[in-house]
């Protein structure tokens, strides 16, 4: 389906990058790999209307994935990646390399659009690096609001 063809597959890579660090078990709780739109809906609570109107690869879906993961995992921080890593699946409107990353920290959710170039592996790797950077920024900004 649409989600399977278009999913960037960055979620598993992101979880792997995090748990490769010693001591990660003290901060990393769970991960969701939701290639199919049905999984995005069932596991993360992404609305059917969001997927129909904006598609799996969109700011709106990235935000709903992040806030849904936050709620499902009862976590303090959640991050989502949805995009088109290629080599196919891209369109003129949504080309290969288009990635949306969402971050939710204690109920405050943002999403950002990225456009990466290169092969599938490079796009996925860049998406994971961008997700870690965005998550760090999201945590720091959220913490500074509390002071």
Task: List each language-model region with its residue ranges.
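Short alpha-helical segments enriched in small residues
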Residues: 1-147
């Amino acid at each position: 389906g649409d989600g399977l063809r278009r999913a960037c597959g960055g979620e598993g890579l992101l979880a792997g990058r995090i748990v490769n660090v010693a001591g990660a078990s003290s901060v990393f709780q769970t991960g969701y790999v939701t290639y199919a739109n049905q999984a995005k809906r069932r596991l993360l609570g992404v609305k059917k209307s969001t997927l129909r109107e904006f598609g799996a690869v969109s700011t709106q879906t990235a935000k709903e994935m992040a806030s849904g993961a936050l709620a499902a995992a009862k976590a303090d921080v959640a991050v989502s990646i949805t995009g088109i890593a290629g080599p196919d699946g891209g369109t003129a409107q949504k080309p290969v390399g288009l990635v949306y990353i969402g971050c939710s920290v204690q109920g405050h959710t943002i999403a950002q659009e990225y456009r990466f170039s290169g092969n599938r592996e490079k796009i996925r790797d860049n998406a994971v690096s961008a997700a870690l950077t965005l998550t760090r920024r999201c945590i720091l900004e959220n913490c500074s609001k509390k002071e």
